[in-house]
Amino acid sequence: DTMVSLIEEAGGEALMAVCDEDAAEQVNQIENFIAQQVDAIIIKPADPAETISIALDKAYEANIPVISVDAPPAEDAKYLSAYITDAYDLGYLVGEEIAKQLLEKYPEGEIEYGIIGAIDGNEIASIRNNASRDGIKAVDTEGRIKEVAYLYSGDFSEEGGLQTAENMIVANPNIAAIIGTCDAHIIGATSAAERLERSDILMGAVDGSKTAMEMMKDGRCIVALAWNSPQEVGHAAVSGTIGLLNGEATPQSRTMIIKGVMITPENVDQYYDPDSAF
């Protein structure tokens, strides 16, 4: 909705197509846009990204620039630029903030934490998780914060987060913090912690969704959110596309990184949007 509004405000027309993560359907949609002779195509690549490469090649041959958001297409695909948030930066921000809060809350002794992974083999999830570990190590120079659990939820859902956190908390009664790969994990994990009377557990994740911010505002377990804002990414992608079509500028790089923002209980009101669809 944000991207459509921005395009229309600039005097353009936005043709929407939703593939629901179906790569074959996205190929058909791109080919339809080419047939309609659109001026540019903005996509969020479906998985597997390699599937849509042939359609992107056709767009290139038709002199239609392709701008990607959220994730880049396959490396060999012909696209102009990808506007993305840095998965490592986002994960690092979460680990860094959780470590700061843990060391302040527990000035002495060993502190235990766990990570809820997503899907084994998912590259972005793995990058986020390892970055969170690095963020913790950078702050915890004495090595007091110990990872005691790393469990895959099997998906990016609240239910997966709830079940995984429940197992994690029961098996590790002294756990002081849980880091999720995404907001859904810690939204579910908060329910698990409250059910087990462990609302003292600190939680953080990447995304910064409206629901997670509301839970933070209510003083529940969530205390750190690295904001992976689709609005910010979409705004940057549309601005870059409009500038390109108006002959004002081309993207400076094939990969345009949108920096993440750390949201905590202290600044959540600055970023919370009650009307957000995300």
Model regions and ranges:
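A residue-level marker of the well-folded mature domains of exported/periplasmic proteins
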Residues: 1-278
